[in-house]
């Protein structure tokens, strides 16, 4: 009988006379104890029929039945052992017989669960191992014994017998300590350990029923499903190659590679599991255990004419079976393993009906690499590193101890046992350490069970080695802690640098000189001079005769550097003079006159905003309260126009964004890191209501960052001077000049980016600044901080003096009156005054808006002034477009602006971007803009199928959408938003009608692509539903009812 079934008493089945007693004991919980003995009572009269015996049995009472069926229990549960009668007989230490399954249907009640009674197999194995010998001699052993016995006979020594040799080799195999070869984990360039990947699928993901297992000999790592190991065996686990041919090298019949996961075709041939999967003719007969490879001969015959283009050894190019490039009419062929080792693009796609399609492309026809392809290439390199380790001989020799040899001598004494031990060791060495007993399970016997790791280390390694290992581990830990401390120091210094830059920019706001502002204006004027007409002086013959006062942008830059411009109005006069000279000299030349008019139109808003900034700064300098708070380091809100630029108001992303989270992004203040005062909500709301144009409730912790462009605002071209700056070409040019200025020693951005903003935001900001001039009340976003009030000294606030290391308690407060009363040329000039009022040099005259190092916004900005957002992405179906509801924020701006618990965090400035990166960001911003503004009835492509967008509020206009469909639509939308709460979902209707479940679907914008019917002929793949989409679009254009 099999394992766990016990030994049968007789050939006939013994009848169980009691089942109700077992049910009672099962309900009482006594079956948790181990049944040691069970006496089976058989009927005295075997001639009675089954029906008669059943009637007799049912007439017997329960107590009478229990007396006929005797059981002795050995309790293992302490709770149940208290309920057992003390009159039970002591457990009998013998094993007679047991019943695994009761005789159902013959007598008694059928049991739902019958406890299994098993032998103590461990004891039986130990007693058998003490006497039984599993090893049998082979021809090689007999040859060695015949040679050795001939020599020992001449010397008169004891000869070897087969029984002695088998006994000694058997005990040596079972008692030796055998440890598989240790393999260290792979590490990356930073020294971090990498997880192994499956040798077949190159995937490191695992699950509870599909783990990555390792061969104990060659350390081959494979998935259970990939290699066909449904159940992980106990003890030693070996791959098929190590189990059958551990010493000999095996070759794949389909490719020249000698490493990897092999399966056996027959007694002499082997194949890779990967080759069987990729070659169309071959497959596994048993897909669970991945065995019984079929059609190998057919594959070799059909593909004998193909040769590998990637084989380094050209002699192996014609061997095996090659696969071909998936590109049509391409005849390139290569082995499966050669293709993967060379990094070719190999993809496996599974359709909905379960069909698997495999594609591989040669280097000439390789498609663009995706993120999955790049990740697969990295995993392939990691697997190649592990393959190189397995190319060497996997020798793992066993270890013997003197106590083991003494035990064998007692069992089977022999005078010259050292010869047997040497021959056994050489035989194991010839097999690369593979055991001689194949069917002996590791750990089945206590005598052969592997010792614990601590015991092995204590027996096999000396004390010096252990001490050295401890020292190495200590050094490793100290290096790891040092690296962590270094990272913390770097982060701390970066925060310090960011804080210092924010304080510097804050002071530049209040004390920026007019000369520096003029330099910024001139740099911006240079950027809009695309033709370089006004960049250099005119050197034409007769130019000075016509023009009395020639001037150009280069002359203006020199005058600004020498400080000749005291006001922006003087600079504006020179610009007007330059444009009038151009019109005078080029009279009759339409090209230059048109260029001059365009330049005048673009430069006028720039000069007007610069003049207003100058006026606003002068107004702020005369504000005693503002200047007092600024000098003492109190973080006050500055509503200047420069702060409201689009690049300043954009959200700065966190340095390490987390994927897959549904929380909204935090809008962070790039200027300040302030812990605001706890003010009353009613006061905040009343203060906010005083700000012109503020209709939304804002957070108290937002500070000055609430100035932003609304989601539904349009970017309109500038038509007059009051419309601020809408000349969007300056934005891109300012970015380029910003990148150039970053090479200087100042850690701030270009001056040109300090006063570029959207028209709407600049108007709002001008309205806010008017309060400082006395016309309106100043905004009360923060509680007033008075230096006269002693209670304010206990409030938490971030001061500049704290950052520079001085004690705020002992520091003397600087007032605006003291600053103005102190002579500028006195010797005891205040330190803060010297650091604030010194005019920076020209080389360091970068803009204070370097914090605005921008990131691309989903609300893309037009590049040409005459193009607005409304027609920037106009497609073929633009005649039926209608905007999405403005209540749903999309993209970066969809964030919780009223979150009271968020803290303002200073982020480091983003990295410097090249011109190519800027262009890529513009394109990406345009794509995001297109994806975030899908209109009702917009033609799109979703997963390769033609569809149209259905806006939820306009779904009733579609004739084919009934009330139940709209209810289902909103229900599915809630389900999708629960999974992807941050993404904007779009409801689409597919034109290809397959069934009712697939006609309508909620999708995310990243899966949607705009369908342009004008250029659809250039698309090579076929789009399902395209014909129906064209017909529907034509009906819309004709005004028909759809």
Swiss-Prot record:
Which regions are flagged for Basic and acidic residues bias?
A: 735-745
The entry's protein name is Protein lin-49
SMART domains cross-referenced by the UniProt entry: BROMO, PHD
Residues in PHD-type zinc fingers: 195-245, 306-366
Q: Which organism is it from?
A: Caenorhabditis elegans
Which GO molecular function annotations are given, in alphabetical order?
zinc ion binding
Query: Quick one: signal sequence residues?
Result: none
Q: Which CDD domains match?
A: Bromodomain, PHD_BRPF_JADE_like
Q: Which Pfam families did the record assign? A: Bromodomain, PHD_2, zf-HC5HC2H_2
């Amino acid at each position: 009988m099999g394992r766990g079934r016990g030994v049968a008493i007789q050939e006939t089945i013994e009848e169980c006379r009691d089942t109700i007693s077992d049910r009672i004991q099962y309900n009482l919980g006594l079956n948790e104890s181990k049944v040691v003995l069970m006496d089976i009572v058989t009927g005295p009269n075997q001639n009675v029929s089954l029906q008669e015996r059943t009637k007799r049995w049912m007439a017997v009472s329960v107590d009478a039945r229990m007396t006929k069926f005797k059981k002795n229990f050995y309790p293992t549960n302490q709770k149940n052992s208290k309920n057992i009668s003390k009159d039970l007989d002591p457990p009998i230490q013998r094993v007679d017989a047991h019943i695994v399954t009761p005789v159902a249907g013959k007598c008694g009640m059928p049991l739902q669960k019958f406890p299994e009674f098993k032998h103590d197999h461990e004891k039986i194995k130990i007693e058998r191992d003490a006497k039984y010998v599993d090893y049998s001699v082979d021809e090689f052993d007999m040859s060695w014994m015949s040679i050795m016995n001939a020599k020992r006979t001449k010397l008169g020594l004891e000869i070897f017998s087969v029984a002695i040799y088998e006994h000694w080799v058997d005990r040596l195999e079972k008692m030796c300590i055998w440890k598989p070869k240790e393999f260290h984990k792979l590490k990356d360039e930073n020294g971090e350990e990498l997880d192994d990947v499956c040798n077949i699928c190159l995937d490191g993901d695992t699950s509870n029923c599909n783990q990555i297992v390792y061969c104990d000999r060659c350390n081959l790592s494979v998935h259970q499903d990939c290699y066909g190991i449904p159940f992980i065996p106990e003890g030693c686990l070996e791959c098929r190659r190590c189990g059958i041919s551990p010493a000999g090298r095996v070759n794949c019949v389909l490719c020249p590679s000698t490493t990897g996961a092999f399966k056996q075709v027959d007694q002499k041939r082997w194949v890779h599991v990967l080759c069987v999967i990729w070659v169309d003719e071959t497959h596994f007969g048993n897909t669970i255990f991945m065995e019984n490879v079929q059609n190998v001969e057919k594959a070799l015959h059909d593909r004998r004419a193909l040769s590998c283009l990637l084989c380094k050894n050209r002699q192996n190019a014609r061997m095996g079976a090659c696969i071909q490039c998936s590109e049509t009419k391409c005849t390139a062929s290569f082995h499966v393993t050669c293709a993967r080792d060379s990094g070719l693009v190999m993809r496996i796609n599974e359709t909905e009906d379960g069909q698997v399609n495999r594609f591989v492309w040669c280097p000439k026809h390789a498609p663009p690499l995706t993120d999955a392809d790049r990740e697969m290439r990295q995993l392939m390199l990691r697997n190649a590193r592990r393959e190189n380790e397995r190319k060497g001989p996997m020798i793992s020799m066993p270890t013997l101890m003197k106590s083991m040899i003494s035990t064998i001598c007692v069992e089977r004494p022999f005078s010259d046992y050292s010869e047997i031990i040497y021959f056994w060791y050489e035989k194991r060495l010839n097999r690369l350490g593979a055991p001689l007993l194949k069917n002996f399970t590791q750990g089945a016997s206590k005598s052969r069970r592997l010792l614990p790791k601590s015991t092995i280390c204590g027996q096999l390694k000396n004390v010096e080695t252990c001490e050295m290992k401890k020292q190495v581990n200590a050094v490793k830990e100290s290096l790891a802690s040092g690296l962590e401390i270094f990272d913390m120091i770097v982060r701390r210094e970066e925060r310090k640098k960011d804080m210092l830059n924010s304080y510097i920019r804050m002071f530049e706001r209040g004390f920026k000189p007019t000369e520096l502002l003029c330099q910024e204006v001139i740099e911006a004027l240079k950027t809009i001079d695309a033709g370089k007409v006004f960049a250099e002086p005119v050197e034409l013959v007769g130019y000075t005769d016509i023009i009395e006062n020639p001037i150009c942008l280069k002359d203006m830059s020199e005058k600004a550097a020498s400080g000749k411009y005291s006001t922006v109005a003087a600079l504006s006069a020179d610009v007007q003079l330059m444009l009038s000279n151009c019109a005078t000299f080029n009279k009759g030349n339409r090209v230059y006159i048109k260029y001059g008019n365009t330049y005048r139109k673009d430069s006028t808003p720039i000069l007007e905003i610069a003049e207003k900034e100058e006026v606003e700064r002068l107004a702020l300098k005369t504000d005693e309260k503002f200047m007092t708070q600024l000098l003492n380091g109190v973080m006050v809100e500055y509503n200047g126009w420069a702060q409201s630029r689009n690049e300043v108001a954009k959200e700065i992303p966190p340095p390490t964004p987390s994927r897959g989270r549904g929380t909204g992004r935090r809008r962070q203040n790039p200027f300040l890191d302030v812990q605001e005062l706890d003010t009353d909500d009613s006061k905040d709301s009343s203060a906010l209501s005083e700000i012109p144009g503020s209709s939304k409730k804002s957070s108290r912790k937002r500070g000055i960052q609430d100035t932003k462009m609304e989601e539904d605002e349009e970017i309109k071209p500038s038509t007059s001077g009051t419309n601020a700056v809408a000349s969007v070409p300056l934005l891109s040019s300012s970015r380029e000049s910003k990148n150039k200025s970053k090479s200087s020693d100042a850690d701030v951005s270009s001056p040109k980016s300090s006063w570029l903003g959207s028209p709407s935001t600049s108007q709002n900001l001008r309205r806010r600044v008017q309060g400082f001039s006395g016309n309106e009340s100043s905004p009360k976003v923060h509680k007033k901080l008075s230096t006269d009030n002693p209670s304010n000294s206990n409030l938490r606030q971030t001061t500049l003096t704290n950052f520079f290391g001085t004690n705020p308690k002992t520091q003397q407060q600087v007032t605006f009156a003291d600053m103005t009363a102190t002579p500028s040329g006195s010797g005891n000039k205040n330190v803060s005054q010297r650091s604030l009022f010194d005019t920076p040099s020209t080389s360091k005259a970068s803009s204070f808006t370097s914090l605005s190092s921008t990131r691309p916004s989903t609300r893309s900005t037009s590049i040409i002034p005459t193009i607005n957002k409304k027609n920037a992405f106009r497609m073929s179906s633009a005649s039926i477009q209608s905007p999405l509801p403005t209540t749903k924020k999309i993209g970066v701006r969809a964030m919780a602006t009223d979150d009271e618990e968020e803290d303002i965090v200073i982020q480091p400035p983003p990295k410097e971007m090249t011109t190519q990166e800027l262009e890529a960001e513009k394109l990406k911003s345009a794509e995001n803009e297109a994806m975030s503004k899908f209109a009702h009835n917009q033609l799109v492509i979703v997963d390769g199928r033609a569809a149209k967008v259905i806006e939820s509020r306009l779904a009733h206009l579609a004739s084919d959408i009934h009330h139940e469909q709209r209810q289902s639509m909103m229900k599915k939308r809630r389900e999708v938003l629960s999974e992807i709460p941050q993404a904007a979902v779009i409801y689409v209707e597919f034109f290809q009608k397959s069934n009712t479940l697939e006609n309508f679907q909620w999708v995310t914008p990243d899966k949607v692509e705009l369908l342009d019917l004008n250029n659809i002929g250039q698309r090579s793949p076929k789009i399902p539903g395209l014909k129906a989409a064209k017909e529907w679009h034509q009906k819309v254009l004709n005004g028909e009812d759809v």
